[in-house]
Amino acid sequence: MRELEPERRGRRWVRGAALFALAILAGLGVAWFGLPRLLARDALHGTAFPDPEPAPALDGLVTADGAPVDLAADRGKAVVLFFGYTSCPDVCPTSLALLSRAIDELGDDREDVVVYFVSVDPDRDTPELLARYTSHFSDRIVGVTGSADAIADAAARYGIFYELHEPDADGYYAVDHTASFTGIDGKGRLRVVWPSEVDVDDLASDLRHLR
C-alpha cells in the first residue's frame, strides 16, 4: 500500500447522507423527531430502511486474497459490512467476536452469510495481516482492503466516518471510526444498520431474515 499523504492523516468526514444518519442513530440508540418518515423497524432489530435500494458497489476494494469484492456475486446471502482496523484495541475485536457468535448461531445456514471487514488503515493492514486477523474470528469474515482513495470512496457511499490520528513518538497512531454494521439482503439491497452492541440473538435472527 502506498503511504498516506500527511493530509490523509487529518480528519476525514465522509458522509453518505441518510446512511451517515443511520449509523449515528444506530450507534447512539436515540430517536429523532420526525424519524418515521426516514426509517422503519419492520422485522429487523437494527435501524431499517423503509424503501430498500441497491447497495453501493465497493469499487476498487479487494479481499485479502486479492479478489475484487463483488456484491452481485453474493446474491442469496446476507452481507454485513464493518469498517475498522486490526490495531483497534477494543471496538473491532469485540464487534467481530459478536458477529462470529451470531454467525455460529445459524448452524448450517452460516454459509449464507458473509461479513466484509473493510480496513480503514491500509498502510498497516496488509492483506496477509488481514487474513490472519479475520481467521481468528470466523471463516465467514473476510478481510478487505484497497487504496486509500478506494477505501475513502467506499466509506463515503456507506456513510462511514473515520479519522487517522497523528503518529506518536513510537510511530503508533489510533483511528476513530464508525462502529456500526451495515446489512445487505439476499437481493443486494441496503436493509439495516445495527449498533455494534446489538444483541447476538437479535443479530442472528436478522441475518436469517436478510438471506
Positions of the model-derived regions?
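Short, small/polar residue-rich loop motifs at catalytic or cofactor-binding pockets
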Residues: 54-56, 78, 176-178
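Structural microenvironment flanking redox-active thiols in thiol-disulfide oxidoreductases
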Residues: 94-154
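Thiol/disulfide oxidoreductase modules built on the thioredoxin-like
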Residues: 150-206
